Amino acid sequence: MSAQPGATIPSAAEIAAIHSAGKIAAVRQAKRAPFFRGRLDHIDLTRLDDPAEWAKIPLLHKDMLRAMPDAEFYRNFCLPPSEDDRIAQYWRSGGTTGRPLFYPRSRRDIEVAMHGFARVYACAGAKPGQTVHCAYPLGIHPVGQMMTRAAEASGLGALMAGAGTTTPSSLQIELIDKLKPDVLTGMSSYALHLANLADQNGIDLAHGSVDLVICSAEPLSAAKREKLRRMWGAEVRDSFGMTEAGMMAAEDGVADGFRVWSDLFFLEVIDPTTGQLLPGGETGALVVTPLFTNNITPFLRWMSGDLVTLRRDVPGAGPFAVFPVLRHAQRTTGFFKIRGININHGEFEDLMFRMAQINDFKCEAVTADALDVLRVCVEIKRNADPAAAVALVEREIKRVFELTPRVETLEVGTLAREFEASVKAPRIVDRRA
């Protein structure tokens, strides 16, 4: 096995050995951070392969980190980089609170994480020598630049196009028609938007060069997958990761779910109420401990906010069959993800109800012109300026959630009548197909 984690696919026996050593190293790393002072003193490092001993480690929630001011987060949770392993990047957390978290990533973190991103291409079926059109948003969230660099590292030609803000969508269609890439990678909603735009311009992508579409960063429903397959005339594969850990998994087209890189991450599925470890195949809360991308951010038993199943020994073809299969069910709390941004329902309500001009509202995640859209319907307080109120809602949602909503006004009383017809007011709803 290679000295660098993730460079090769290990055997099942090697993965077990990686877990034994990696869990000890992860706890030792965490104990260096002031945040964990006094939280891990009762842990017996010689018994971490015993699930009961490992379960004594307290679960880590994002709210614990969000509660810290920036200076405290970097001082108490993050570890100082070593002389030979300086900070290489900062990754923005996928969640939003008005004060997003920015995780430092060291050079060694990035080297290992790059293998996780590169595996997506190999697992999904991309081959060296092919060309990839990379259409993820470009910025401090890592997926766009990391998937592009991973394509290059995998022997694939890469076009870093972005998701419409850096390279206009119309130009991207021209480039796809002209350069004839084999693979498109991007968020599913943007891939559909490109397909619709191509159709409007008389370009038949279904009979074009792209034969593989790789998605990530937002939910991929069965209906959306089928529409992508039909419009692009391509196989569609999804992938799964999180900023706290890195790219963690991808579909191989055989198993029903993601092959998850269990040599880079130690995964648990627990009962979200009792915290008890669940048997394989049962739905529970995903808990992640990065084993090698923790040189500055020592995430330990991280509650990701996802409900999943995890099955081991799932038959498959090729080297990735050694990995367990993770199937994503839903978020454990009130979230939905739009264009890679997690919208927390409670935080959204707090924001809306702080605006004096707004009487009531409902928020819906919808699909419009193949793009995921945040539609916000508002009832405006009498005597308030409707145009100014709409502008305020747009501005505040953009400021806090970094997402531009589609705001519509309703006659006062409309929502009350809707809510009265339901036992539980459907104020925030995901209506995407």
Which residues fall in each region the model found?
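Nucleotide 5′-phosphate-binding alpha/beta core
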Residues: 1-92, 98-115, 122-123, 178, ...
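AMP-binding/adenylate-forming catalytic core of the ANL superfamily
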Residues: 184, 292-403, 423
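Active-site phosphate/ATP/adenylate-binding loop shared across adenylate-forming ligases
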Residues: 4-6, 63-231, 237, 245, ...
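Conserved AMP-binding/adenylate-forming
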Residues: 211, 215, 220-314
